[in-house]
């Protein structure tokens, strides 16, 4: 990969495609980079500022240009403010997140030097970094840091792939997440975190919960649309201490389910209503990213989806299921099997078998709609959650040992 010498001015490009997953990763990366750069010389070019505002309330979705957290934030579409700023100060590094491409005005500025205010700018190199989606597939190691050509001798390009191995870029370890993770590692710290969450902005909703809400087995659900009847039934059986056949097996385990805002919330709540409200349910509003992190870290078991929450589930160090985005010809199963192979070394065979079965059942489908039922069973994982915890903790520790993706990216650029 071509290196940039001297101060690093970084531009992050983001087009919101899949709900908030894309901007979620970009926002987290921006925060992590700011923790490493002094000053945090970052410019963000985003096409959906409303989505950005949902994660970072300081963003004003009505402005084409603004300063947020010390960053310059530009709307994707061509604006006078963006062109003026980039003509006066060309970027040394442009990170294209998830193959989003470049705005037309930036494309012209990068590849048509006379457009810059300073005629000497044409001699300055620029590095385009193609930050790809997270994957556990082997190609992540093959393509990480691979250079490629552009139509300019002064504009270079290379790929940067997140991943779960030392030959990839790792995952983003932002300070806010890692600090909350450290608190949630112990049971005492997790209970303290839960009490804070329930007494904060959600205090009004939490008043309807049982008095022992913080001490219950917390399960967080954030996936795609589907019929959640079987998952609700398993959660109810676990709470009542019943086996899959309905026979008493273990002592009842009072639970609290957190239904995250998004595609899955209404579907899950509907299945819960049909089942007779068998356990307490807290419907979460859409939360700023750092608040969402804390709810996920406070949970004993999670079912997550997408990109950013998948990476946070992997780093949390507690049992979780991941639902991949459904693709044509069920290609998501290739991604799921690759991830299972990353998990496998951290579990013994007897524990891994039901875990793998649950991952496959959750993901092996052509589409997700509110009426799409599946045969997934989470009860075996819930019953084995204590024994599975060691394997997930070991897996998380192995990822953290790789280092911070943001730090590795900056080290590569300098």
Q: What are these model-predicted stretches?
A:
Residues 13-154, 262:
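Active-site and donor-binding regions of nucleotide-sugar-utilizing enzymes
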Residues 244-285:
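Catalytic donor nucleotide-activated moiety binding site of glycosyltransferases and closely related
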Residues 398-414:
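C-terminal alpha-helical cap of glycosyltransferases
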Residues 231-248:
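Short hydrophobic signal-anchor/transmembrane segments that target glycosyltransferases
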Residues 11, 15, 20, 27-31, ...:
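A donor-sugar binding/catalytic signature common to diverse glycosyltransferases
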Residues 305-392:
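Catalytic binding pocket for nucleotide-activated donors in carbohydrate/polymer assembly enzymes
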Residues 132-229:
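A nucleotide-sugar donor-handling region in carbohydrate enzymes
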Residues 9, 92-93, 127, 218, ...:
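Structural motif
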